[in-house]
C-alpha cells in the first residue's frame, strides 16, 4: 500500500549526520493531486505514527543518503524482479530506487547469487574438504546451465593439484562481493513461520470470518444456486465482517468441477444435486485464512458422497492429531495418506497404495500467514506455527473405478495452530462432520427472504 519505498535495517547502529540509526525508511512524499487519483499516502509523519519507524525520509533522498554499503561485511537483500518498469516522470519510483541501490553497492552487471555462493563455499573450504567440494561443484554444474558456463568453476573442477586450486581460489576471492540475496529470505522464512501473539490474533479474526462465510452458505444453499452466487455470499460475509480482500482467488466447484484443485472459474449456472467444494479465505489486515468445506447442495449426503466424505474426515482427524510440536512438516500428510489408502481400498476404488495419487494428488499442509502459502523453514514444528490440514479425494469422470464414484470431490481444510499444549483448530466454527453439516443446512438463513427483482 506504500509503493516505491526502501527499508534499510542495520545489524549495528549507524551514525548518519550525528544521529544513531538502527533502521531507515524511505517513503513517497505526500501529494494531494496524486492522492486524489491513487489514494492516501502515509508520508513521513504517517510512517512514524502508524508504522513506528523513528527515522523516515522521502524516497527522493535515498540516492544521496550517506551510507557506505561497501564497508559492511554483508549486504542482505531480496533478489530483484526483472519486470519492474521505469516511470520516466518519477525519479524515485521503484525502478530508480533499485538502480540507486545498485550504484551504491557497486552491483555487478552479471551478479549471480548461486555463483557467488559457490565461490564463497569453495574459497572458505580447506584441503580436507576437497571431496565434499568436488561433489557440490559437480552437482551444481550439472543442474545449473549458467554455472556450467563459468570459466573459473570449470577450471576448478578440472584442476589436477592443490596449487592450481589455490590459484583459482584467489581469483574467485577477488570477485566475491559483500552482496548476499540468499540469507535474508531464510531469515524472513523463520520469522514468518513462527507467529507472534499479535499475528495469531489477526489470523484468528481472518479465520473466523472465513468460517462464518462457510456457515452462512450452508444455511443458504439450495440446488438451483450457481457457483458464482455461492462465491458472492462468502465474499459478502468477508466484507461485512471487515475483511479487506480475499486471500486468494475463491474456489467454488460443484460436482466434477471440484476435481480441479485450483478451479476459480466458478461459472456453473446450477450446482444441482452435486457436492459443492468451497475453498475460500478472507484476508484481514494482510493476514489470510484458508478454509474449505464440501457440502451437499440439497442438504443431504448420498450414500456414495458420505462414504468418501467419511474417509476424508478421518484422514483430516489423523492429520490434525499429527500436527504437534517437534513433528515434521510431512507428518500430517503421512497420517492422512495412510487413512485414505485404507479407505479407498475398502471401497474397491484402488487395489494398491501406489494408486492413491490418482485421487489424492496434493500435499496435506502448508504454512499460513501473510500469504496463503506462507514462507517457512520446513523444520520441525514449533509453538505458534500455523498450518493448514487439508486432505482430499477427487474422482474425475472416467476414473478406473465404479462409475458411481465419478464426479465426487471432497476436501476438508482447517487452519491449525500448533502449540506446546497440542493443535488448536481455529476454523472449528464451521461444522465439518457430515451430521454437523446437514444439521447446519437445515437452519434458516437470513438470505431466505432476500429476493432481488
Tell me what each language-model feature is.
Residues 1-453:
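Active-site neighborhoods and metal-handling regions in enzymes and metal-associated proteins
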Amino acid at each position: 500500500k506504500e509503493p516505491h519505498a526502501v527499508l534499510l535495517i542495520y545489524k549495528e547502529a549507524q551514525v548518519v549526520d550525528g544521529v544513531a540509526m538502527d533502521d531507515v525508511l524511505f517513503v513517497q512524499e505526500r501529494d494531494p493531486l496524486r492522492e486524489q487519483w491513487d489514494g492516501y499516502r502515509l508520508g513521513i509523519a504517517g510512517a512514524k505514527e502508524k508504522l513506528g519507524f523513528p527515522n523516515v525520509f522521502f524516497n527522493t533522498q535515498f540516492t544521496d543518503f550517506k551510507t557506505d554499503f561497501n564497508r559492511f561485511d554483508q549486504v542482505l537483500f531480496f533478489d530483484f524482479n526483472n519486470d519492474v518498469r521505469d516511470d520516466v516522470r518519477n525519479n524515485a519510483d521503484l525502478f530508480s530506487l533499485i538502480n540507486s541501490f545498485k550504484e551504491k553497492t557497486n552491483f555487478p552487471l552479471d551478479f549471480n547469487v548461486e555463483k557467488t555462493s559457490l565461490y564463497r563455499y569453495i574459497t572458505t573450504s580447506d584441503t580436507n574438504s576437497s571431496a565434499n567440494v568436488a561433489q557440490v561443484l559437480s552437482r551444481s554444474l550439472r543442474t545449473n546451465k549458467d554455472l556450467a558456463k563459468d570459466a573459473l568453476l570449470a577450471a576448478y573442477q578440472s584442476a589436477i593439484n592443490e596449487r592450481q586450486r589455490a590459484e583459482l581460489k584467489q581469483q574467485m576471492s577477488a570477485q566475491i562481493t559483500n552482496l548476499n540475496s540468499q540469507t535474508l529470505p531464510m531469515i524472513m522464512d523463520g520469522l514468518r513461520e513462527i507467529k507472534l501473539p499479535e499475528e495469531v490474533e489477526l489470523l484468528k479474526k481472518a479465520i473466523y470470518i472465513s468460517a462464518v462465510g462457510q456457515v452462512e452458505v450452508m444455511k443458504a444453499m439450495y440446488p438451483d444456486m450457481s457457483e458464482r452466487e455461492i462465491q458472492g455470499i462468502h465474499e459478502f460475509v468477508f466484507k461485512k465482517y471487515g475483511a479487506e480482500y480475499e486471500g486468494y482467488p475463491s474456489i467454488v466447484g460443484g460436482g466434477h468441477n471440484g476435481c480441479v484443485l485450483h478451479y476459480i472459474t466458478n461459472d456453473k449456472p446450477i450446482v444441482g444435486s452435486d457436492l459443492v467444494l468451497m475453498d475460500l479465505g478472507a484476508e484481514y489486515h494482510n493476514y489470510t485464512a484458508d478454509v474449505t468445506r464440501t457440502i451437499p447442495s440439497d442438504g443431504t449426503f448420498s450414500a456414495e458422497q458420505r462414504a468418501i466424505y467419511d474417509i476424508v474426515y478421518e484422514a483430516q482427524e489423523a492429520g490434525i492429531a499429527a500436527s504437534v510440536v517437534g513433528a515434521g512438516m510431512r507428518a500430517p500428510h503421512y497420517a492422512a495418506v495412510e487413512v485414505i489408502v485404507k479407505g479407498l481400498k475398502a471401497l474397491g476404488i484402488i487395489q494398491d497404495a501406489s494408486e492413491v495419487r490418482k485421487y489424492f494428488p496434493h500435499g496435506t499442509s502448508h504454512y499460513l500467514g501473510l500469504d496463503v502459502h506462507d514462507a517457512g523453514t520446513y523444520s520441525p514444528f514449533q509453538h505458534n506455527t500455523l498450518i493448514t490440514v487439508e486432505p482430499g479425494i477427487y474422482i474425475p469422470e472416467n476414473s478406473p473405478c465404479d462409475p458411481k464414484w465419478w464426479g465426487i470431490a471432497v476436501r476438508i481444510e482447517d487452519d491449525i495452530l500448533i502449540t506446546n499444549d497440542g493443535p488448536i483448530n481455529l476454523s472449528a466454527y464451521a461444522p465439518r462432520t457430515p451430521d454437523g453439516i446437514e444439521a447446519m443446512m437445515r437452519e434458516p438463513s437470513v438470505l431466505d427472504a432476500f429476493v432481488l427483482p
